[in-house]
Amino acid sequence: MRLKKRFKKFFISRKEYEKIEEILDIGLAKAMEETKDDELLTYDEIKELLGDK
């Protein structure tokens, strides 16, 4: 079975691209800063939190 791709093509200027890239970088940096002290959970801990034992 073939899936049809439904992508629209559009073009942006180099300046617009760089602006979008800068915004994404700022968002990533903020997300990394906010989660730097978070503990990572194991798969089993996540299942337990969800009530799936």
From Swiss-Prot:
- Superkingdom is Archaea
List keywords of the entry alphabetically: Toxin-antitoxin system
Q: What Pfam families does the record point to?
A: RelB-like (PF18506)
| UniProt entry tagged with the keyword NAD | no
Keyword field contains Translocase: no
Assembly behavior: Forms heterodimers with RelE and possibly a heterotetramer RelE3-RelB3(2)-RelE3 from 2 heterodimers. The heterotetramer is probably not very stable in solution.
Q: What does this protein do?
A: Antitoxin component of a type II toxin-antitoxin (TA) system. Probably neutralizes the toxic activity of cognate toxin RelE.
Specify the protein name.
Antitoxin RelB3
Q: Lineage in the entry?
A: Archaea, Methanobacteriati, Methanobacteriota, Methanomada group, Methanococci
Q: Which gene encodes it?
A: relB3
